[in-house]
Amino acid sequence: MKKELRYGYTTGSCATAAAKAATYMLFNDEILKSIKIDLPIGKEIELDIFYIERKEGEVICGVRKDAGDDPDVTHNMIIYAKAEKSKEFLITGGEGIGVVTKKGLPLQVGDYAINPVPRKMIESEVKKVLPEGKNVKITIFAPEGKYIAKRTLNPKLGIIGGISILGTTGIVEPLSDEAYKKTIDLEISMASSESNEICLVFGNYGKNFTTLSSKMPLVTMGNYVGFALESACKHRIKKVYLVGQIGKMIKVAGGIFNTYSYIADARNEIFTAYLSLYGLDRGILEKVMSANTTEEILDLIEGKVGKDFFENLALRIKEKCTQYVKGCLEVEVEIFSLKKGHLAKTWSDFK
């Protein structure tokens, strides 16, 4: 029986709870052990206050980040908020919160990386406990953030010096496909501010194989070929170079745009269909159908098909992708093998 995965809370929810608790204690002679906050999705949650420090005119509270069963590098770190009496209402960042240095994010260059939804959450919840006629300055900080950020996408996104305060729902969905798609979309958005051409790869094999990263932004799309192409269209990318290992690319040749094996795994069938057009005998085709890997298939057909087989396969993949995006952008394709290296591509070498 499959274990039900546990949800967690975003850095945005933790920052909001810490800020609300600190503000409440700044104006009330009471120590809180926990505090309730409303989430953007209409739910109310209660988070424990892990740390409290009271000084004249300010209170600091800390909330421990619980990512649930999601493999989040910020799990267990403490998100702090300092509330100070002020002449105006202000939310800012401090130690361990990253600073934006590149365009393409929903924040201005120079801003602390407290995203719009968490910022709105903090403001809304703090004002619920803020006495009428009073104002407060909220500083969000996380001393561990400057170290943990190195294990996140922040350096690549141009967010330096710390983590981001994130979250659109307030909760972390464990191992979420949607969270990964949001990352892909964000990377493509960032890339679009630098270039109207990008290279899409499935993972580390593609990263290590291609030399295009020296010529244009490179985005890792995982198995989400279709989503990445749609995102590229949305962000007005003009040309996509799709580079992938034959095991993934053969699926795209069959019109499969989510290459997760549990979604669709017809590698052998698609290979067999294309090879049958080249007149291979039934015995070879049967071996192809029962092969364990695409690399094994390449060994089976070595010397039986020419370079033109892979060139035509690459053109077919290009055609499938162009049809998928309805011509909104140009697609070029390169196929490689882990054992045999470059197999085919649809573009001429760069000058």
From Swiss-Prot:
A GO BP entry: anaerobic cobalamin biosynthetic process
Assigned EC number: 2.1.1.195
Domain of life: Bacteria
Pathway listed: Cofactor biosynthesis; adenosylcobalamin biosynthesis; cob(II)yrinate a,c-diamide from sirohydrochlorin (anaerobic route): step 6/10
Catalytic activity as recorded in UniProt: Co-precorrin-5B + S-adenosyl-L-methionine = Co-precorrin-6A + S-adenosyl-L-homocysteine
Keywords noted in UniProt: Cobalamin biosynthesis, Methyltransferase, S-adenosyl-L-methionine, Transferase
UniProt cross-references to Gene3D superfamilies, sorted A to Z: CbiD-like
InterPro entries membership: CbiD (IPR002748), CbiD_sf (IPR036074)
SUPFAM superfamilies: CbiD-like
Keyword Zinc-finger included in the entry's annotation: no
Entries under Pfam families matching the protein: CbiD (PF01888)
Keyword ATP-binding: no
Gene Ontology MF: a single term: cobalt-precorrin-5B C1-methyltransferase activity
Record family assignment: Belongs to the CbiD family.
Listed name of the protein: Cobalt-precorrin-5B C(1)-methyltransferase
Organism in which the protein naturally occurs: Thermosipho africanus (strain TCF52B)
